[in-house]
Amino acid sequence: LYNMPSHVKVFLEPATVKTLANHSNIIGLKDSSANMTYFQTLLYHLGDNPDFSLYVGPEELTGECVLLGADGGVNGGANLCPELFASLYRALRDSDLEQVRRLQAEVLELGKLYRSRPGAAGVIRGLKYELSRRGLLKNVLAFPALPLRG
């Protein structure tokens, strides 16, 4: 399941997610709502289900969500700095809170590279621009979104 109300204008209610989590073909959810209260509610309702994984989208919340019980993050910034996010996850796994705070601060700084544009597609536009600037991909987006230009 994917909860991203800013893009699809539909919000997956926690009770609905809990019901769907019992379906054999549904194994997890990525939440990109950036709503910590919502994510905590999901953890409360689904934390006792070892067969259902919960992931967070916004990397600014990865540290907090994993500390609360999330299985991890699906973070766009990991495409730019994979070692930073791998180090963050290792620090979270090892409960090294001092290291988590330091790395999470780096994640926040990294986000400034690609979170400067408003709108629902702003992060995607910023990430694609930065990745193309580094020669990792072409700066092409699906219509109607337009790519950023340098």
Predicted regions and their residues:
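Conserved short secondary-structure transition element at the edge of the structured enzyme core
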Residues: 62, 66-71, 109-145
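Catalytic alpha/beta core domains of metabolic enzymes, predominantly
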Residues: 7-111, 115
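Short beta-strands and strand-loop turn motifs
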Residues: 1-3, 141
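Short, intrinsically disordered, charge-balanced linker/junction segments flanking boundaries
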Residues: 147-150
